Amino acid sequence: VTNTGNVTISGLVINDAQLDAAAVCPVTTLSPGASTTCTGTHTITQAEINAGTVNNSATAVGTAPGGGTTTSPPDTTTTPITASASLTIDKTAGTPSGNTAGSTIAYSFLVTNTGNVTLTGLQVSDAQLDGPESCPVTTLAPGASTTCTGVHTITQAEVDAGVVNNSATASAFPPAGPVVTSPPDTTTTPITASASLTIDKTAGTPSGNTAGSTIAYSFLVTNTGNVTISGLVINDAQLDAAAVCPVTTLSPGASTTCTGTHTITQAEINAGTVNNSATAVGTAPGGGTTTSPPDTTTTPITASASLTIDK
């Protein structure tokens, strides 16, 4: 502060509404031409950080010998504040509600404002969620966090793979500049595979009761596991040829009926029954083989013993 007049100024003070406390002046009386340097401190506000500048104006005020007040013209400083907008996301997967397609996984997303500016319009981007995420707040001050939630319905492809991989990011708008997006966070949730088949074998009525007669068999095969089974075949050593299956890939819960034929032998006629056992075999997504428990049919053959003599 400089006294640019021709009279002594006393009671010098600084008028600056943004100072934390009154400015400190080493002297408060100035002769004409004399100067002094006063000091003060301002604590930066979040609003100023969001704006990117601190604009501060001050005047000097003193009293002339006649008692009148003298005020300097104002002087203003503009101090730039570097904005740093950033977010993090910490994704957590809950326990799946089951291990079949249609089961669900609940996710939580802890989003934190790790920058120095207020962020608005918070959103979580996760393409696998069934619907929009739910965030209790969408405006975050620096250092603040919120936990958003969402649900994903498990697909058959994920059950077959044995895992649900899910990645998410958080994004929001800083006071100025482009949208800011967090690095992605990914969860890996294992899904327990359970591959199983059943077979229900049915024997038709024999075409006759002599060697060379035939029995038509049907095999109802059901995928009773939670993974897709492919390469389905029937293991039945007594069939004349490989069983025919209209489909060889079964989704969980799906069934197909395969068919095959057996030609009755003389030994079976002599025994009076045809005992026939079969299993269904398929391949699980991981490459392992799945075999059903065997199912057996017993088909009675009517014996007819007779002789003739021609003497």
Where are these regions (language model features)?
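Exported/extracytosolic protein signature
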Residues: 1-311
